[in-house]
Regions:
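Terminal helices and disordered tails flanking the catalytic cores of nucleotide-processing hydrolases
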Residues: 151, 160, 170-330
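Sequence-structural signature of the catalytic-core scaffold of metal-dependent phosphohydrolases
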Residues: 1-214
Length: 330
């Protein structure tokens, strides 16, 4: 988030040092904004929006941070971070296209036509209700089918562990932000060892296997709290992972514990916290839940069926599963 704001303000360059010489007439984002009469500071302030709470917008709670936003007219900020914002419409359509999963196809043109600003807030005209419902359903389905799919989780964990265990052998985090995927993979390959092995496995789709998973309702409160604590503490999580790996006769790193969302464990939030306002044909504004029963169904729908995954290399699933069961759940 701070990097994004820095780019808009001109405090952070997205080009690796020395590469700018190969680009002709390059303009920074603040220069482009100022050429069009826009204040970079105002634009950067919209990044955190009323629903972002000063960080990346919570994907599980639309209203988080709303009370911390000061200002009368929130229209622009809500278009960036809100119940119906440009980011959601963009990533649903884009990710649906590139993954081939059609759940994310929404009638974005109709929905945009029905967006209105009312008293500094964003509302949806009743004529766009079907399009809004379609977007909310699409969002929920995309999270289940793509973003929280177990294979997605496995690949993300493998890459994150490769970076995590590379330690100081990688360029600093700000420098990595300037790199494209291929460059980051090349850096991980140069590190060697575990990091090289993980990116090689990703390259040839020799992925880690999920050997144990649990739903929240299948765990005791003590188990839930322990997993949540470990997920929030890098050292504690790595200690658990490496303990299981050692007992299974594996090298450190070849057992991974993944908690897709700690919030799912602690408070069981739902994908659709129904804080969308509908402008009726009678001119009155109502909450979505007052207009359609679908809102309540969406609110109750869980993002991920599984609260925790334990992963390891192929051929070691049974042994790791038995050990992880004893350490984590007994």
């Amino acid at each position: 988030m701070e990097v994004t704001k820095g780019i808009i303000l001109g405090e952070y360059d997205v080009i690796v040092e020395g590469e700018g010489e190969s680009l002709d007439d390059r303009k920074s984002i603040p220069e482009i904004l100022e050429d069009r009469g826009l204040d970079p500071k105002l634009v950067s302030s919209l990044i955190t929006g009323p629903d972002a709470s000063g960080t990346e917008r919570s994907l599980l709670s639309w209203s988080e941070g709303q009370s911390d936003f000061s200002g009368e007219d929130r229209t622009l900020a809500l278009l960036v971070h809100g119940p119906v914002d440009c980011d959601q419409l963009d990533y649903l359509l884009r990710d649906s296209h590139f993954t081939g999963v059609k759940h994310g196809v929404v009638d974005h043109n109709r929905l945009i036509e029905c967006l209105r600003s009312q008293s500094g807030d964003i509302v949806v005209e009743q004529g766009g209700l079907s399009s809004l419902e379609g977007m909310l359903v699409a969002r929920g389905l995309m999270y289940s089918a793509v973003y929280f799919h177990r294979v997605t989780r496995v690949t993300e964990v493998m890459l994150s562990r490769a970076v995590e265990r590379a330690g100081d052998n990688l360029p600093d985090s700000l420098d990595l932000q300037r790199r494209v995927d291929a460059e980051i993979w090349a850096e991980l390959d140069k590190v060697g060892g575990f990091s090289r092995d993980m990116v090689t496995r990703l390259k040839y789709r020799n992925l880690l296997k999920v050997c144990l998973s649990r739903r929240k309702e299948d765990m005791t409160q003590e188990q839930v709290e322990r997993l949540a604590k470990a997920a929030n503490n890098l050292a504690e999580r790595r200690e658990l992972e490496d303990d299981i790996a050692y007992r299974a006769g594996l090298e450190p790193g070849y057992v991974a514990i993944d908690v897709p969302s700690v919030k799912l464990l602690l408070s069981e939030p739902r994908m659709a916290q129904v804080d969308v306002k509908i402008l009726g044909d009678d001119g009155k504004t109502r909450w979505l839940k007052e207009v359609t029963p679908m809102a309540e169904a969406l609110r109750r729908r869980q993002v991920s069926q599984e609260a925790v995954y334990v992963m390891t290399t192929s051929g070691n699933e049974r042994r790791v599963s038995e050990i992880a069961q004893k350490i984590l759940f007994e």
